[in-house]
């Protein structure tokens, strides 16, 4: 039984779990949800807040902001594209946090189940790369000596153009 709060992350129906939330990401529950009888592989990627960024030591926390109305449709486009490229996907979850996150906290989850590991790894890699390139979520970094918007921001692309 999944333990996440339905008011925060609604019950999942179907085989795609797409969400933007200010609350803690359900790492263990998303893994359990992805396990399917016909799938021998589940790949779970959890992006966590690290203590440094390019040219910046001593990162203390990140604050994520998003264009809320556009996030889930973009996540849906990524899931759709992944299913076109890897039709054997059993389940796919794309979940991202907003708000202030301290070092070590999970900010993004990509979970993919497939019958075999190669496809699960490939699809998960595609999904996180497409999410980073096409979903309007931005991070503000706070470190010992100051703060600024993240240096790794890229222009927003369509999921289908990510290779």
What are these regions (language model features)?
Residues 1-107, 113-115, 121-125, 129-163:
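N-terminal, polar/charged subdomain of small-to-medium soluble alpha/beta proteins
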């Amino acid at each position: 039984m999944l333990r996440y709060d339905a008011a925060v992350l609604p019950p999942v129906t179907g085989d795609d779990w797409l969400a933007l939330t200010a609350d803690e990401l359900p790492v263990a529950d998303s893994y359990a949800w992805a396990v399917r009888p016909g799938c021998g592989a589940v790949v779970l990627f959890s992006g966590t807040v690290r203590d440094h960024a390019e040219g910046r030591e001593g990162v203390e926390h990140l604050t994520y902001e998003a264009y809320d109305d556009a996030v889930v449709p973009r996540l849906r486009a990524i899931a759709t594209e992944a299913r076109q490229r890897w039709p054997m996907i059993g389940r796919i979850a794309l979940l991202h946090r907003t708000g202030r996150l301290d070092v070590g906290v999970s900010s993004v989850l990509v979970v993919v189940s497939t019958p075999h590991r190669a496809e699960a790894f490939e699809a998960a890699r595609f999904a996180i790369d497409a999410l980073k390139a096409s979903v309007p979520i931005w991070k503000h970094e706070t470190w010992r000596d100051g703060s600024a918007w993240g240096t790794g921001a890229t222009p927003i692309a369509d999921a289908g153009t990510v290779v």
